[in-house]
Curated annotation (Swiss-Prot):
This is YTH domain-containing family protein 2. GO terms for biological process: embryonic morphogenesis; endothelial to hematopoietic transition; gamete generation; hematopoietic stem cell proliferation; innate immune response; mRNA catabolic process; mRNA destabilization; negative regulation of Notch signaling pathway. Residues 337-349 have a biased composition (Low complexity). One of its GO terms (molecular function) is N6-methyladenosine-containing RNA reader activity. The lineage of its organism: Eukaryota, Metazoa, Chordata, Craniata, Vertebrata. The modification Phosphoserine is found at S2, S4, S5, S22, S39, S196, S359, S394. The disordered regions have the ability to interact with each other and to 'phase separate' into liquid droplets within the cytosol following binding to mRNAs containing multiple m6A-modified residues. This leads to the partition of m6A-containing mRNAs into membraneless compartments, where mRNAs may be stored, degraded or used to transport mRNAs to dendritic arbors in neurons. Residues 291-316, 372-383 have a biased composition (Polar residues). Widely expressed, with highest expression in testis. RNA binds at K416, S417, Y418, D422, W432, C433, N462, W486, W491. Specifically recognizes and binds N6-methyladenosine (m6A)-containing RNAs, and regulates their stability. M6A is a modification present at internal sites of mRNAs and some non-coding RNAs and plays a role in mRNA stability and processing. Acts as a regulator of mRNA stability by promoting degradation of m6A-containing mRNAs via interaction with the CCR4-NOT and ribonuclease P/MRP complexes, depending on the context. The YTHDF paralogs (YTHDF1, YTHDF2 and YTHDF3) share m6A-containing mRNAs targets and act redundantly to mediate mRNA degradation and cellular differentiation. It comes from Mus musculus. The keyword Glycoprotein does not apply.
Length: 579
């Protein structure tokens, strides 16, 4: 039922009998009690939208009001001149900070809910003032002049950015600083307003502003602590004021330094990793490249030595890239320390090479150590070849082109090694040793063939991601002999082998071949001494024989020779201490 229809049904000239002191008058209300609320407008104000519009068309205008006259206080019988006033959501009128409760969402609607689309906060039923969450103030001992709806009305704001303040007057003929509904402010969100006399004295008064009201100053709310901090009166400078300014800026500076410190170290770390790895020669900076040329010109006895020399030149480059930053300097020094340890026992660094050297061995036979090495099958001669490797190549015809992979009789097994050190020594001494269970299986296979066909072993290092070669089993297992050359002393037994292929073949070349005797898993996902059926073994041997490799363990043969010498010296020292 619209307000315009109610105007035609109600007579004029009857006063309101309902007071604001008590709201428990459900049964005693008459239709004449609401005459002041719905009477025709004596002084219409065309600046506001008519109340008959259910959905306010000017919802997003800077300010929205209702066309009630000032002489007829709509919901108050105390003669107050409050008028309903609503503001648009988040509207700033005169550039003032919007720190006061907004009238659009700060007042309760029907049954205490939020008004819908800017509708006024009165209840839908005129007799339902007792449902107002803020209207029942009979127990507060306040004046009876204010009604349950007094907190829902506000005077037109002047310079508070569309916020609502009770008791404000926007017209010159109205009394300033008059807030009749202050008894309900303590109970609602509308009470959030400036309550400090010092703030009121420091802020200039504006017509219609209730900042300087004495009745409002008693209502201090904790949430209004921010505005006084920003508009506090000037005080003489003291050490506390001076210290407070750096205190606000200092965390930001520390945060920036922290961010800069955390973002700057990665480039030098990556730069040093490029220098220290076996694969990359370090073409990033000029200083490492010069050191690399010097290392190539020196006589090479082992691969770790150039790495250590090259790593010692890396910290100045890292420091130069960082500049005057002092925080990123500590990370680079441990790297030369680690590489110096690797110069003595380069086990950690060496095991990085098999996995990543595919990108570092495309430089005309020069590996990541900066030492000229011959790639297997490439035909190039090393600048400083190792004598042991040259002797092995002269005796054995590695990677033959006329290999007969189409076997009529024979057996093939997968061999998984713990490290490339053992692969190096197997090639060097032409022997191998498996686990106790593996030795029995290989020995039985060799004896079952009885010379009718070969027993091939497909070697792969755990975690390397490639097969490193193929060897043929040449003798039965001797269980009573310990070779004593392996990187670990737990292996017992020995049998002779002859290496045929020494090349790195990635698992991606062989992953499509699956073994029906191993749950149909790829041949690359096999355990030690896993037998490969003959038909599948032919496919594997064909791929390995025809694969054009770029890397092999021969590229790091000098490195493993040095490692073996170091291990043997350590064993001799232990034996000398034991005696």
């Amino acid at each position: 039922m619209s307000a315009s229809s109610l105007l035609e049904q109600r007579p004029k000239g009857q006063g309101n009998k309902v007071q604001n002191g008590s709201v428990h008058q459900k049964d005693g209300l008459n239709d004449d009690d609401f005459e002041p609320y719905l009477s025709p407008q004596a002084r219409p104000n065309n600046a506001y939208t008519a109340m008959s519009d259910s959905y306010l068309p000017s919802y997003y205008s800077p300010s929205i009001g209702f066309s009630y006259s000032l002489g007829e206080a709509a919901w108050s019988t105390g003669g107050d001149t409050a008028m309903p006033y609503l503001t648009s959501y988040g509207q700033l009128s005169n550039g003032e900070p919007h720190f006061l409760p907004d009238a659009m969402f700060g007042q309760p609607g029907a049954l205490g809910s939020t008004p819908f689309l800017g509708q006024h906060g009165f209840n839908f039923f005129p007799s339902g003032i007792d449902f107002s969450a803020w209207g029942n103030n009979s127990s507060q001992g306040q004046s009876t002049q204010s009604s349950g709806y007094s907190s829902n009305y506000a005077y037109a704001p002047s310079s508070l950015g569309g916020a609502m303040i009770d008791g404000q007057s926007a017209f010159a003929n109205e009394t300033l600083n008059k807030a009749p509904g202050m008894n309900t402010i303590d109970q609602g969100m509308a009470a959030l307003k400036l309550g400090s006399t010092e703030v009121a004295s420091s802020v200039p008064k504006v017509v219609g502003s209730a900042v300087g009201s004495g009745s409002i100053t008693s209502n201090i709310v904790a949430s209004s602590s921010l505005p006084p901090a920003t508009i506090a009166p000037p005080k003489p400078a003291s050490w506390a004021d001076i210290a407070s300014k750096p205190a606000k800026q200092q965390p930001k500076l520390k945060t920036k330094n922290g961010i800069a410190g955390s973002s700057l170290p990665p480039p030098p770390i990556k730069h040093n990793m490029d220098i220290g790895t076996w694969d990359n020669k370090g073409p990033v900076a000029k200083a490492p490249s010069q050191a690399l040329v010097q290392n190539i010109g020196q006589p090479t006895q082992g691969s770790p030595q150039p790495v250590g020399q090259q790593a010692n030149n890396s910290p100045p480059v890292a420091q130069a890239s960082v500049g005057q930053q002092t925080q990123p300097l500590p990370p680079p020094p441990p790297q030369p320390a680690q590489l110096s340890v690797q110069q003595q026992a380069a086990q950690p660094t060496r095991w990085v090479a098999p996995r990543n050297r595919g990108s570092g061995f495309g430089h005309n036979g020069v590996d990541g150590n900066g030492v000229g090495q011959s790639q297997a099958g490439s035909g190039s001669t090393p600048s400083e070849p190792h004598p042991v490797l040259e002797k092995l190549r002269s005796i054995n015809n590695y990677n033959p082109k006329d290999f007969d992979w189409n076997l009529k009789h024979g057996r093939v097994f997968i061999i998984k090694s713990y490290s490339e050190d053992d692969i190096h020594r197997s090639i060097k001494y032409n022997i191998w040793c498996s686990t106790e269970h593996g030795n029995k299986r290989l020995d039985a296979a060799y004896r079952s063939m009885n010379g009718k066909g070969p027993v091939y072993l497909l070697f792969s290092v755990n975690g390397s991601g490639h097969f490193c070669g193929v060897a043929e089993m040449k003798s039965a297992v001797d269980y009573n002999t310990c070779a004593g050359v392996w990187s670990q002393d737990k292996w017992k037994g020995r049998f002779d082998v002859r290496w045929i292929f020494v090349k790195d073949v990635p698992n991606s070349q062989l992953r499509h071949i699956r073994l029906e005797n191993n749950e149909n898993k790829p041949v690359t996902n096999s355990r030690d001494t896993q037998e490969v059926p003959l038909e599948k073994a032919k496919q594997v041997l064909k791929i390995i024989a025809s694969y054009k490799h770029t890397t092999s363990i021969f590229d790091d043969f000098s490195h493993y020779e040095k490692r073996q010498e170091e291990e043997e010296s350590v064993k001799k020292e232990r034996q000398g201490r034991g005696k």
